[in-house]
C-alpha cells in the first residue's frame, strides 16, 4: 500500500495517476475530502492536525507521501504545517513505512546563485521560515535513521488542472480568459519552471527507488532556464493570441496588498522575480538518464489541448 497525505492538491492527483500507471500501486488517498483519481483508489478522510487520525490513515502503508498544501496564509502555515508534518512523520515511523516529502524552494536565498541540493537555507519572510523549519524536521528524521526518508524539491510550477502558481495565475489562466498575460517585476530574468506532471512522475520514481532514500533530490526541469518574455511568447503562440504582456512593478502589487490579504501574503516571494532563478536538477538527471522531461513548448501544447477539451465538454453540458 502506498499512501498520499494531502491528496486533493494538483501535485498529489498527478502523483496518484503515475503511481497507478507506472507502478501498479495499491493506493490510498487521504485528505479532509478525498476524491478518486483512479478507479482502484482507496479513499480515507482524515485531519492531519489530529495525530490519531493521521496514524490510522497510514496503517499498513509501505510508502507515505506528504504532499499537503494550505492557502497562502502565513499565520495558518505557522500554526498548522509543522503540526501536520510532525504527525505524518510520527505516524510513518510508528508503522515502519518509507517517507517521501514533497518540498518547494521557499527556504532558498532569493538571488541568482545556482540552486543545488546542498544550497544553504536563507529564508526570507514568514512562509519561507516555515518551509525551512519543515525541511529541517524531515532532515532530522532522515538522520535519525529509523525509517527511510527522502525529499523531492521543485521550483515554481506551471501545469494543467488546478495547478497553483504565479505563472499559471498571471499568464496561463489569463490567456484562457482572453486577457493579456502579466509578468511579475521583470520579463528578462531567467526562470526555471517545472511541468506539474513531471514533478509527480519524478516523485513517484524516487519513492519506488530504494537507493534514492536518505537524500534530497531536485526534481527534473528543462536543461535551459527561460525568461518570462520567452515563455509568454511561446504561450501566446500556442494559444493563438497576440504576443503581448504587461510587466507588473512593485508599486501596484504593494498598493493591492494594502487592501487585500492575498497580494499581501505573496509579497515576500517577489524578490525571486528580480533575479535569475537557476534550479539545478542535474543530480536527478544523472541518476535517471532515461527520464523524459517535458519541454516548455510541449507543456504549453498539452495545457492548451486540455483546456480546449474541457471547454468543449462545458459547452455540451
Region locations from a protein language model:
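Mid/C-terminal beta-alpha module of Rossmann-like enzyme folds, strongest
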Residues: 2, 202-266, 281, 295-296, ...
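Conserved beta-loop-beta element that borders a ligand/cofactor-binding pocket
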Residues: 104, 136-161
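Conserved loop-to-helix N-cap of the C-terminal "lid" that shapes the substrate pocket in Rossmann-like
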Residues: 151, 187, 192-200, 216, ...
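Glycine-rich "substrate-gating" loop/helix at the edge of Rossmann-like oxidoreductase active sites
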Residues: 155-165, 185-197, 221-223
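A conserved pocket-lining segment of Rossmann-fold NAD(P)-dependent short-chain dehydrogenase/reductase
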Residues: 173-194, 205, 211
Amino acid at each position: 500500500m502506498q499512501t498520499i497525505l494531502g491528496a486533493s492538491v494538483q501535485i498529489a492527483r498527478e502523483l496518484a495517476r503515475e503511481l497507478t500507471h507506472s507502478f501498479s500501486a495499491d493506493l490510498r488517498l487521504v485528505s479532509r475530502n478525498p476524491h478518486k483519481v483512479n478507479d482502484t483508489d482507496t479513499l480515507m478522510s482524515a485531519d492531519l492536525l489530529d495525530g490519531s487520525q493521521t496514524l490510522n490513515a497510514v496503517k499498513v502503508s509501505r510508502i507515505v507521501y506528504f504532499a499537503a498544501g494550505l492557502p497562502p496564509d502565513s499565520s495558518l502555515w505557522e500554526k498548522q504545517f509543522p503540526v501536520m508534518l510532525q504527525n505524518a512523520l510520527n505516524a510513518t515511523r510508528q508503522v515502519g513505512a518509507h517517507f517521501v516529502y514533497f518540498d518547494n524552494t521557499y527556504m532558498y536565498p532569493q538571488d541568482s546563485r545556482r540552486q543545488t541540493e546542498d544550497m544553504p537555507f536563507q529564508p526570507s519572510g514568514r512562509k519561507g521560515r516555515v518551509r525551512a523549519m519543515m525541511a529541517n524536521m524531515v532532515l532530522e528524521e532522515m538522520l535519525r535513521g529509523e525509517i527511510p526518508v527522502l525529499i523531492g524539491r521543485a521550483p515554481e510550477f506551471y501545469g494543467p488542472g488546478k495547478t497553483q502558481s504565479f505563472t499559471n495565475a498571471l499568464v496561463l489562466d489569463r490567456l484562457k480568459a482572453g486577457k493579456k498575460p502579466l509578468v511579475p517585476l521583470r520579463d528578462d530574468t531567467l526562470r526555471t519552471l517545472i511541468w506539474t506532471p513531471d514533478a509527480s512522475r519524478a516523485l513517484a520514481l524516487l519513492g519506488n527507488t530504494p537507493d534514492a532514500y536518505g537524500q534530497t533530490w531536485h526534481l527534473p526541469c528543462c536543461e535551459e532556464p527561460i525568461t518570462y518574455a520567452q515563455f509568454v511568447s511561446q504561450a501566446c503562440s500556442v494559444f493563438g493570441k497576440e504576443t503581448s504582456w504587461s510587466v507588473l512593478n512593485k508599486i501596484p502589487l504593494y498598493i493591492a496588498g494594502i487592501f487585500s490579504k492575498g497580494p499581501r501574503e505573496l509579497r515576500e516571494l517577489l524578490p525571486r522575480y528580480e533575479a535569475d532563478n537557476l534550479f539545478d536538477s542535474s543530480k536527478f538527471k544523472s541518476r535517471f538518464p532515461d527520464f523524459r522531461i517535458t519541454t516548455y513548448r510541449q507543456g504549453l501544447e498539452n495545457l492548451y489541448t486540455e483546456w480546449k477539451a474541457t471547454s468543449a465538454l462545458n459547452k455540451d453540458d
